[in-house]
Amino acid sequence: MISMEKSHCYNPFVYLQNDNDVQKLVTNLFKSTTPKGSQSQDPFWDTSASMLLLALVFYLHYEAPEDEQNFAMIMEMLRAGAIEDEEDTRPSPLDELFAELEMSNPDHIALKYYRSYHSGAAKTLKSIQITLAARLEKFNLESLASLTTTDELDLPSLGEKKVALFALIPDNDSSFNFLVSILYTQLFQQLFYAADHIHGGSLPVPVHFLMDEFANETQL
C-alpha cells in the first residue's frame, strides 16, 4: 500500500466462491471502513447501502465476464444508477440492467437485494447511493482501481509452496487499511478451505503470520 504502482495486484472478487463469500466481503468492507469507536445513530443508511453493494457484487459475480469483476466496475455501475433529478421518474441505466436480468432470471439473488434497496422514494435512494459512494470513494483513485482490477497473489498457494507475502502499510496513513483487512480475511478463508477440503486437514507448507500492529490497524 506504500507504492501501489510497484505492488502485486489484488482483486478480492477472484476469491468469491459462493454466496457466503460475497456476504463476507461486503460485511468486512463496511466494518473496516467504519472508524473505530463510531456508532451510527440510524443504521438504516448503512444497511441499505450494503444491500445495494450486495446487489452489484452478486450481479458481477454471476453475470459479468471475469475481467469486469472488480471494484472499478462497481464504481461504474454506481455512477450508472446515480439519481440526478429526484423528479425524473425515468429508469437509470442501472435500473434497465436489472430489469433485463429480471426478464431472464426473476429469482436471481442480485435482484432480491436490488429490489430491497429500490423500494424507497427517489430522495431516499439518492441518499443510499451517496452513503455507498462514501464507503467506496477510495476506488475512484486510479492507483487503487488499477491495484484491484486483476489478481496476482494466488492466495491458496501460500500453503502449498514456500513464499513470503508482505503487506506494507504506511505508518502515517490509514486510508487504505480496509483493503488489508479484506486481504487478511480472504487469506484466512482460503487457507482454511484448502487445509480442510483439499489437503486432508493441514496445509503442505505451514503458514506463519507476522502481523505488527495488527489489532490497531485492521478489523476482521
Q: Where are these predicted regions, by residue range?
A:
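P-loop NTPase motor domains
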Residues: 1-220
